[in-house]
Design a protein with these regions (language model features):
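Leucine-rich tandem repeat or coiled-coil scaffolds
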Residues: 1-404
Length: 404
């Protein structure tokens, strides 16, 4: 902390009180993760700008044992990325996780990051979601993936990626040997041909590393789901599939349900905010009751599912004990549905923390109230966000590669 103040004084940069506070709290000397985010829930904090990053990097250059740097929700621009690149290029760098989500990084910043990562052997996780790097920035990242063979997690949601960069990234994923978690949600796709789905299918057929794939807000239709299902049928590594906020209806779900009957690896599926309706829920229910289905957690919130479809899902839970988490809020909650979920909860078949509804009775009638539980956003944490099942699954693959 004192060194940080001295550096600020040397370069005549105003001291950032938030940085000082975090450095004061950091006493560990090994496996250090610095969390300097700009979105504190309880009180306002001074967000970091490029000058703050320059001063911080000056301090971190001499600090050993830094493995994580969480800088999301700040005001870092392409200029700040130049300083962070110096940290990544440091000869004895131990930084394995870098979170820059929701800053002000654009195409040039993405290019600088990619240049620094081409020779980097320690960074395992890069989160850039919410930075408008655009189509060209996505192309730089796709090129980087062809040369970097150590990165394991890449988040690029809400980055304004175009169809060219989406396809280029998916093609790079076909041959990448370590990348097992990718988020490409909400690109800017103006084509309705869903070419990306064809390439994604080809990638899933040959990729035996991918564990978690986020494809939310892709504009996916039933045709896209049909193509995706072709790849899922032959894939044996994917555990988590996120296709929320798309345009999938009962016809698309039918293709997915056929895959689930045979796929022994898919455990978590997010179908929130689609339009599968009652027929789609029935297709899912049939798949869940099959012995070959391995789905443990399912979200179908806001899908216009009426009583018959929801009852089919509750019956599937009774028949198959594999499914332990289900999220259904935002659908039609007729009283038979309310009673069915009350029975699941009261019998212990469905735990209260594993669903987003709670039953209550008024004047002899059963109703459901919303409970603020939701499907976990990452495979590596359980529904409480504490149990690192992802690490235990991947074992040594999550350990940093030694610097060369």
């Amino acid at each position: 902390m004192e060194f940080y103040k001295a550096v600020c004084a040397k370069y005549k940069v105003k001291i950032n009180s938030h940085v000082v506070e975090v450095l004061q709290r950091t006493t560990a000397t090994e496996n250090v993760t610095l969390t300097i985010t700009g979105n504190h829930r309880l009180r306002p904090v001074q967000r970091l700008d490029d000058d703050d990053i320059r001063m911080l990097v000056q301090c971190l250059q001499i600090k050993q044992g830094l493995t994580g740097l969480d800088l999301k929700f700040n005001n870092i621009t392409d200029e700040g990325v130049i300083y962070l690149a110096e940290l990544l290029q440091k000869e004895n760098s131990s930084l394995s996780c870098l979170d820059l989500m929701f800053n002000d990084i654009l195409t040039d910043g993405a290019k600088i990051l990619c240049s620094s990562l081409q020779g980097n052997r320690t960074l395992l996780s890069l989160r850039l979601s919410g930075n408008k790097i655009g189509n060209k920035g996505g192309m730089h990242l796709a090129k980087m993936l062809q040369e970097n063979d150590t990165l394991q997690e890449l988040e690029l949601a809400d980055c304004d990626l175009g169809i060219q960069s989406i396809i280029a990234l998916i093609i790079s994923m076909k041959s990448h040997k370590t990348l097992h978690r990718v988020d490409l949600s909400r690109p800017l796709l103006f084509s309705h041909l869903e070419e990306w789905a064809v390439h994604c299918t080809d990638m899933l057929v040959v990729n035996c590393i991918m564990v978690e794939l986020h494809l939310a807000k892709m504009g996916m239709t039933d045709t896209g789901m049909q193509r995706l299902a072709e790849g899922l049928r032959l894939n044996r590594s994917l555990r988590y599939l996120d296709v929320r906020c798309n345009r999938v209806t009962r016809d698309g779900i039918r293709y997915l349900a056929e895959v689930l009957k045979q796929n022994p690896t898919l455990e978590i599926i997010d179908l929130s905010s689609n339009r599968i309706e009652g027929e789609g829920a029935k297709y899912l229910s049939e798949a869940i009751t099959c012995p070959g289905c391995s789905v443990k957690e399912l979200s179908v919130t806001r899908n216009n599912i009426k009583a018959e479809g929801l009852l089919a899902l509750t019956q599937a839970m009774t028949a198959n004990k594999t499914l332990t988490h289900i999220y259904v809020w935002g659908n039609h909650k007729d009283e038979p549905v309310c009673k069915a979920f009350r029975d699941l909860l009261s019998s212990g078949r469905l735990l209260p923390q594993h669903t987003d509804v709670s039953a209550y009775e008024v004047d002899g009638h059963i109703y459901l109230a919303e409970v603020f539980n939701a499907l976990r956003r990452h495979y590596r944490t359980d529904s409480s966000g504490t149990n690192d099942t992802y690490n235990s699954l991947l074992g040594d693959r999550l350990k940093p590669t030694a610097s060369t």
